[in-house]
Amino acid sequence: MAADNSKQFWKRSAKLPGSIQPVYGAQHPPLDPRLTKNFIKERSKVGTVPLKNKKASSFHEFARNTSDAWDIGDDEEEDFSSPSFQTLNSKVALATAAQVLENHSKLRVKPERSQSTTSDVPANYKVIKSSSDAQLSRNSSDTCLRNPLHKQQSLPLRPIIPLVARISDQNASGAPPMTVREKTRLEKFRQLLSSHNTDLDELRKCSWPGVPREVRPVTWRLLSGYLPANTERRKLTLQRKREEYFGFIEQYYDSRNEEHHQDTYRQIHIDIPRTNPLIPLFQQPLVQEIFERILFIWAIRHPASGYVQGINDLVTPFFVVFLSEYVEEDVENFDVTNLSQDMLRSIEADSFWCMSKLLDGIQDNYTFAQPGIQKKVKALEELVSRIDEQVHNHFRRYEVEYLQFAFRWMNNLLMRELPLRCTIRLWDTYQSEPEGFSHFHLYVCAAFLIKWRKEILDEEDFQGLLMLLQNLPTIHWGNEEIGLLLAEAYRLKYMFADAPNHYRR
């Protein structure tokens, strides 16, 4: 009994405020043991799979099988002798991955963009999680035609789909020269920011379609409410707030080793390496130490929620933007040890305060039972049922629950669905909108979902739909795609925000 308790100690904490909540993630699709057990029986019934197979793909089964979104192997040694490993059919795993790769290969942008502001990615380039995944991906092409995917087949424990690269902001020194329009916008920003009392309403209006990289750090500080509009007060405010943050470090950080804080710190320590694992910047020990301090201090100062998995992602846009204030070159590969101690302290403190301001507006997303997220997912379902009934009915037909894919969209603010450069552009608008991270985000999620309506309607089984929704091909997205997404979200908000009965049946 004691052994069982110790095994589950880190996986499910007590239901108290501040306890770690499970996070549904695309990197960890559900595995139903019953589906695996019945796989051999079902293979003999090819072509006779019913659209609704009792409870096999129901939400309750999904929730039970995804009570922990993180792989067990991420926290502790995997037991390869366990029944789940013994019953996993490798051919099924290969067939599943191959089917998804085949279905979505047509969505990948193959022509190279000659004047792109993003990092160039060869047409045949695929980011693979590990060398073993690469081998499985190569071998799967031969099995996809021989082993068609059925709803009753189980998914692999780990996805074999290439991970979506989280490429950093457009910081490369080789970026194309600014156009006349861009120069005019930059000058307008500089005039606003240098005025004695910055007109915040005008600044929000100018920032909605995107903030120039050169003035983004100070603009974000102002829009988040971290800096005052009065230019004479800014220097003293920054100095005071930065000293206050490092006062918290001196006061609280050593308590991470105390018994009542060990759970929180350990979970943070586990999650930090998972934050943007494909960007070298975030794998540097010094950067990970900065993130650990930021998250631990925030958790200590917000006991109602404490640290929840997913909050770690929200630090990264602020960190990259404030780092770009000191770095001209490509940020994602920059070695932060080249910066002075004062620069690093400024970046850390500013990231902490701006993240705190963001979370102040959405803290009910992270309190016990995460009621804010549940409410937003329900609102998304109601909204989609009105704006695209065909997509909504398609989900119902194949028993796909919105919580199965939209939980992460709300928990991580679409950060796991988009490249980091797109997240930064998205946040320009979120910080310009009233309640951008809470209210406007709902309409962005609705627009994002409908963007893929054709691909959604092409999928005709439960597993295919989930694999699509949890691995949407946005690797080549840039400012143009985000601009169109935001325009559609604004249209939906204009139509429905002031008339909630429009999306109530």
UniProtKB/Swiss-Prot annotation:
Q: What positions are modified (N-acetylalanine)?
A: A2
Q: Which Gene3D superfamilies match?
A: putative rabgap domain of human tbc1 domain family member 14 like domains (1.10.8.270), Ypt/Rab-GAP domain of gyp1p, domain 3 (1.10.472.80)
Q: Does the keyword Acetylation apply?
A: yes
Feature: compositional bias, Polar residues: 129-146
Q: Which GO terms describe its molecular function?
A: 14-3-3 protein binding; GTPase activator activity
> Which InterPro entries does the record match to this protein?
Rab-GAP-TBC_dom, Rab-GAP_TBC_sf
PROSITE patterns the UniProt entry points to? TBC_RABGAP
Q: Does the keyword Nucleotidyltransferase apply?
A: no
The alphabetized UniProt keywords are:
Acetylation, GTPase activation, Phosphoprotein
User: Which superkingdom?
Assistant: Eukaryota
- Pfam families reported in the protein's UniProt record: RabGAP-TBC (PF00566)
Q: Which residues carry this modification: Phosphoserine?
A: S58, S116, S154
Question: Assembly and partners?
Answer: Interacts with ACBD3 and ARFGEF1. Interacts with YWHAB, YWHAE, YWHAG, YWHAH, YWHAQ and YWHAZ.
In UniProt terms, what function does this protein have? May act as a GTPase-activating protein for Rab family protein(s).
What is the designated name of this protein?
TBC1 domain family member 22B
